[in-house]
Amino acid sequence: MKALTTRQKEVFDLIRDHITQTGMPPTRAEIASRLGFRSPNAAEEHLKALARKGAIEIVSGASRGIRLMIEEESGLPLIGRVAAGEPLLATQHIESHYQVDPALFKPHADFLLRVSGMSMKDIGIMDGDLLAVHKTQDACNGQVVVARIDDDVTVKRLKRQGNIVELLPENSEFDPIVVDLRQQELTIEGLAVGVIRNGNWL
């Protein structure tokens, strides 16, 4: 594949992220809206350029007729540092892929998150571990979730009562995080479904 310009890379990343999150490519109108193009025609020109460079295939007669031609890396993506306001699974956040069968976890894992800190050590989630996460916004009280509070991503046990959410640590040395949903934004990014142990303690 020929090298992409910065703008073409933005379009390509948007297509790939949209497929990752929704299971389908975006329409021309969605690309134009997300990237600030004046019209879907401008998006179409970028798509044609990507097709000429071998990055995508345009399927005629369909508003979502875009197929990625670059082979995706297999395995579960490992999410690194997350930029503010961007999707957790955006391409730029993926550090690498691990050859782990998602079906080993119930429900299945969609991605891995490297644990930072010891706030959940009492249930065996240690600093440096890889946390297997099932991507969902639905979570019940008592479940261990990956939550985003403003710009920060954290792993805690969920407790919600009305507009007040407590994110509880599993380590008495740490305090709960209390979020008033009327004043602060909180997003559930997924459920913890398993742990791959960091081997440094061996």
Swiss-Prot record:
SUPFAM superfamilies: LexA/Signal peptidase, Winged helix' DNA-binding domain
Residues under site feature: Cleavage: 84-85
Pfam families registered for this protein in UniProt: LexA_DNA_bind, Peptidase_S24
GO terms, biological process: DNA repair; DNA replication; negative regulation of DNA-templated transcription; proteolysis; SOS response
DNA-binding region: 28-48
UniProt keyword annotations, A-Z: Autocatalytic cleavage, DNA damage, DNA repair, DNA replication, DNA-binding, Hydrolase, Repressor, SOS response, Transcription, Transcription regulation
Matching Gene3D superfamilies: Umud Fragment, subunit A (2.10.109.10), Winged helix-like DNA-binding domain superfamily/Winged helix DNA-binding domain (1.10.10.10)
UniProt GO MF annotations: DNA binding; serine-type endopeptidase activity
Active site: 119, 156
InterPro entries assigned: LexA, LexA-like, LexA/Signal_pep-like_sf, LexA_DNA-bd_dom, LexA_repressor, Peptidase_S24_LexA, Peptidase_S24_S26A/B/C, WH-like_DNA-bd_sf
Keyword Chloroplast: no
Reactions this protein catalyses: Hydrolysis of Ala-|-Gly bond in repressor LexA
Top-level taxon of the source organism: Bacteria
Free-text function comment from the UniProt entry: Represses a number of genes involved in the response to DNA damage (SOS response), including recA and lexA. Binds to the 16 bp palindromic sequence 5'-CTGTATATATATACAG-3'. In the presence of single-stranded DNA, RecA interacts with LexA causing an autocatalytic cleavage which disrupts the DNA-binding part of LexA, leading to derepression of the SOS regulon and eventually DNA repair.
Subunit architecture: Homodimer.
Protein family (similarity comment): Belongs to the peptidase S24 family.
Protein name: LexA repressor
Organism: Sodalis glossinidius (strain morsitans)
